[in-house]
C-alpha cells in the first residue's frame, strides 16, 4: 500500500468516491429490494451477536449511496437517519436513492474524524467498510463515542482482516488469469473505457489498512466503549465474491449479461448463509475477510 499523509488520504478518498458515485450501485450490485434488506439485517445481527432492536436515530459514517442506512430504514430497524460521508458525490447518489424510495434522510458532508455534530445525539452510530479508509480510526471511534447517547450502540462492519486480506489474493489472481476465457464465454469485451473521472485509477490508494480482531477490540475499548465484541463474517462467500468481482471488473460493464450478475449475487448470498451456519462463531474471527466490531457507550 502507498504511504500517504492524512491530508492526501482524505483528498484521494474524496476524488475516488466522487468519481465512482454515478456507477457505484451497479458496480457493487447495491439494491434496496427485500433480499438486500434481509442481508443488511443479517449483517447487523451478526455484528451484534443478537437480533437487533429498533433504533430511533442513527448516524451512518461513510454512508456512500445508502446501502446500509436506507435498507435499515426500509427494514424498520431505524426511524431517523443522518447519513454522513466525506464525498458529496456519494451523498448526492444517496439522496436520489432516498427520494426514489420515499425516505426522508438528512445528509451531511463531513470527516468521520471531526464530526460537526453535538454530543449525545444518536442511539446508533454505524459504518460499513469505512475504518480501513481513515487516517486515524481511533479518532473516529472517539467521535462516535462523543455523539452517542449513554447506552447507545456503535457498529462497524465490513473491515478487512489481515489474514483474510492475504487469503483473498488467491481468488483475485485466479480471476485475472481466467478473465479472458470468461469474457469470451459470456460474449463481453474488455473494459478499455475507464476514464480518469471515474476514479478507477485511485481505487488502489483508498484502502490504507487492514485489522486484526484484537486490534479492533482495543481501538473500541480505548475510545471508551463497553461490551466490545469483534466477530468475523464471510469465508467462502468472500472467496467467491472476489473471484466473481475480479471477472466483472475486467469486462465492459454494459456487456455483462444480467443473468451472470444475478448468478453472482445469488451465489454470494447462498455462500454467506452457508458461512453463517457452518463457520461464523466457530472459527477464529481473524480467518474471515470481514471483521465487525460493536460496543456500547456507558
Q: Can you name each region flagged by the protein language model?
A:
Residues 1-52, 68-71, 153-188:
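Conserved class I S-adenosyl-L-methionine
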Residues 124-135:
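A short SAM/SAH-binding and catalytic strip from SAM-dependent methyltransferases
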Residues 138-150:
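A short glycine-rich, Lys/Arg-flanked "PGG" loop and its adjoining helix->strand segment in the class I
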Residues 217-218, 228-298:
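A C-terminal cap/extension of S-adenosyl-L-methionine-dependent methyltransferases
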Residues 199-215:
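Acceptor-substrate binding/catalytic loop of class I
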Residues 113-124:
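A short acidic, Gly/Pro-enriched loop at the edge of an enzyme's catalytic core
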Residues 59-61, 65-114:
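Class I SAM-dependent methyltransferase SAM/SAH-binding core
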Amino acid at each position: 500500500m502507498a504511504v500517504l499523509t492524512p491530508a492526501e488520504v482524505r483528498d484521494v478518498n474524496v476524488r475516488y468516491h466522487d468519481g465512482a458515485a454515478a456507477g457505484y450501485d451497479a458496480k457493487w450490485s447495491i439494491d434496496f429490494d427485500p433480499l438486500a434488506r434481509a442481508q443488511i439485517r443479517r449483517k447487523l445481527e451478526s455484528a451484534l451477536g443478537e437480533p437487533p432492536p429498533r433504533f430511533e436515530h442513527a448516524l451512518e459514517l461513510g454512508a456512500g449511496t445508502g446501502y446500509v442506512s436506507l435498507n435499515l430504514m426500509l427494514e424498520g430497524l431505524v426511524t431517523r437517519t443522518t447519513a454522513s460521508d466525506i464525498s458529496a458525490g456519494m451523498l448526492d447518489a444517496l439522496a436520489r436513492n432516498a427520494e426514489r424510495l420515499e425516505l426522508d434522510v438528512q445528509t451531511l458532508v463531513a470527516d468521520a474524524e471531526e464530526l460537526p455534530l453535538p454530543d449525545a445525539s444518536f442511539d446508533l452510530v454505524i459504518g460499513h467498510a469505512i475504518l480501513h479508509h481513515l487516517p486515524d480510526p481511533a479518532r473516529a471511534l472517539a467521535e462516535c463515542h462523543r455523539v452517542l447517547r449513554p447506552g447507545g450502540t456503535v457498529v462497524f462492519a465490513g473491515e478487512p482482516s489481515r489474514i483474510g486480506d492475504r487469503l483473498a489474493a488467491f481468488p483475485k489472481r485466479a480471476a485475472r488469469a481466467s478473465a479472458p476465457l470468461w469474457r469470451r464465454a459470456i460474449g463481453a469485451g474488455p473494459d478499455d473505457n475507464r476514464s480518469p473521472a471515474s476514479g478507477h485509477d485511485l481505487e488502489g490508494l483508498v484502502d490504507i489498512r487492514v485489522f486484526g480482531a484484537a486490534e479492533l477490540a482495543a481501538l473500541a475499548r480505548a475510545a471508551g466503549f463497553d461490551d466490545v465484541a469483534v466477530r468475523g463474517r464471510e469465508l467462502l462467500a468472500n472467496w467467491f465474491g472476489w473471484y466473481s468481482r475480479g471477472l466483472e471488473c475486467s469486462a465492459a460493464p454494459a456487456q455483462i449479461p444480467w443473468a451472470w450478475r444475478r448468478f453472482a449475487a445469488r451465489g454470494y448470498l447462498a455462500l454467506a448463509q452457508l458461512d453463517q451456519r457452518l463457520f461464523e462463531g466457530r472459527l477464529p474471527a481473524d480467518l474471515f475477510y470481514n471483521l465487525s466490531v460493536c460496543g456500547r457507550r456507558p
